[in-house]
C-alpha cells in the first residue's frame, strides 16, 4: 500500500496559496484492507474512506470509463493493480493531476508543473470531453486563478467549444450548474467565469438572459463601454471588490437583464428596463433553482437600482415607500446590499471605476433616520390597530423630510 497527497492540496501549495482540504489516493490496497486499518467507508459509487483520526478522504486509485450520458455516466474500476498514473490520468486539468509522496517528492506524469509555471489550464487527456461539468469547472478555475494570470490553453478552450456545440451541457442538472456558479461567484474575479462561458458558447446555453446583453448598446454618455454585456461583467467585477457576499454579486450580475428585451429600434435607450428585468431574474432563478434569498435580492436590485441613482430627486414619501418595498424593516441588511449593488452599477463603467457614489451614503443615512423613529412612542400616544402603522409611516416620512432638507441636495 502506498499513499499519495493529490490534486488541489499539491497544486495550491506549489502556488503558495493556503491549502484548505487535503485528498489522498491509496495505491495497491483493497476496501477490506482499508476497513481493517480502521478507515470508515463513505463512498457509495467507488471506494472512498475517512481516516480514523484526521477524517480526511482517502480514495483507492481508480480508473473511469464512459458508460452513459452527462457527468454521472461513468463506470469506476478500483483495484490494487490501478497505478497512480492511471488515477491521475482521469483528472480534468494537468495542474490537478499532481501527486506528492511521503518524502515530499512531486509525481508529475502529465506536465502539471510546467503548466503551473506557465500559468496554463490544460486538460489531461481527450477524456476531458466526456464530462460536461468540466466546462464549468475550468471556467471556475480561470476565475479563481485570474489574479495569478492563468489562462486556458487554446486546445482546451477548443474542446470546451466542441462539447458545448455537441449539446453536452444539456445533461447538466440545474443544481450542479448553480453550485459551480455559486462557487465561481466567491472568487476574486467572478466575471472571468462568465467571460469564459461566453468564449466557449456555454453562456448562451446556460445563461441566455445574460448572453442576450452582449451587442446591446447603451447611451455612450452614460456608458462609454457601450455594450451592455461588457458593462454587466464590469459591474460584477466591481461588486466583487465591494462585497464578498454571493447574493450581492449575483444581484449585480442580473441588474440589467431587462435591457435584453428592448426592441432594437429603441436602442440605445432602455426605459423601464428595471421592472422588465424582474421577470427575467425570476425565469433564470427558477431554471437554476437559485436559493430564494439570493433570488429575492436580485429581483429587488433589478427593479430599484435606477431609483437609487436618482436618490436626491426622491421625495421623503417615496424613500420610505422604498424601504417598505424591500422589506427593510424585517430585513435591514437589504439597504446595504442595495447600496452596494447600485454603487457597483455606477462604477462598473469605463472611466468611472474610481467614481464617488454619494447616493449610497444618502440611502444609508435615510435608513438610519427612518428606523430610528420609535414604534413605542406611537403606541403610547394612543394609536391602535392599523392606525399604528399609518402614524409610524407619517413620522418616518417627517423624519426623512427633515434629514433630507439638511443633508441631501435636491440634485446631483
Curated annotation (Swiss-Prot):
Magnesium is required for nucleotidyltransferase activity. Nickel for phosphatase activity. Its EC number is 2.7.7.72, 3.1.3.-, 3.1.4.-. Gene3D superfamilies: Beta Polymerase, domain 2 (3.30.460.10), cca-adding enzyme, domain 2 (1.10.3090.10). Pfam families: HD, PolyA_pol, PolyA_pol_RNAbd. Residues 228-329 form the HD domain. One of its GO terms (biological process) is tRNA 3'-terminal CCA addition. ATP binds at residues 8, 11, 91, 137, 140. Its cofactor is Mg(2+); Ni(2+). InterPro entries: CCA_bact, HD/PDEase_dom, HD_domain, NT_sf, PolA_pol_head_dom, PolyA_RNA-bd, tRNA_CCA-adding_enzyme. PROSITE patterns: HD. Keywords: ATP-binding, Hydrolase, Magnesium, Metal-binding, Multifunctional enzyme, Nickel, Nucleotide-binding, Nucleotidyltransferase, RNA repair, RNA-binding, Transferase, tRNA processing. It catalyses: a tRNA precursor + 2 CTP + ATP = a tRNA with a 3' CCA end + 3 diphosphate; a tRNA with a 3' CCA end + 2 CTP + ATP = a tRNA with a 3' CCACCA end + 3 diphosphate. It comes from the Bacteria. CTP binds at residues 8, 11, 91, 137, 140. Mg(2+) binds at residues 21, 23. One of its GO terms (molecular function) is cyclic-nucleotide phosphodiesterase activity. Monomer. Can also form homodimers and oligomers. A single active site specifically recognizes both ATP and CTP and is responsible for their addition. Belongs to the tRNA nucleotidyltransferase/poly(A) polymerase family. Bacterial CCA-adding enzyme type 1 subfamily. Catalyzes the addition and repair of the essential 3'-terminal CCA sequence in tRNAs without using a nucleic acid template. Adds these three nucleotides in the order of C, C, and A to the tRNA nucleotide-73, using CTP and ATP as substrates and producing inorganic pyrophosphate. tRNA 3'-terminal CCA addition is required both for tRNA processing and repair. Also involved in tRNA surveillance by mediating tandem CCA addition to generate a CCACCA at the 3' terminus of unstable tRNAs. While stable tRNAs receive only 3'-terminal CCA, unstable tRNAs are marked with CCACCA and rapidly degraded. Comprises two domains: an N-terminal domain containing the nucleotidyltransferase activity and a C-terminal HD domain associated with both phosphodiesterase and phosphatase activities. This is Multifunctional CCA protein. The lineage of its organism: Bacteria, Pseudomonadati, Pseudomonadota, Gammaproteobacteria, Enterobacterales.
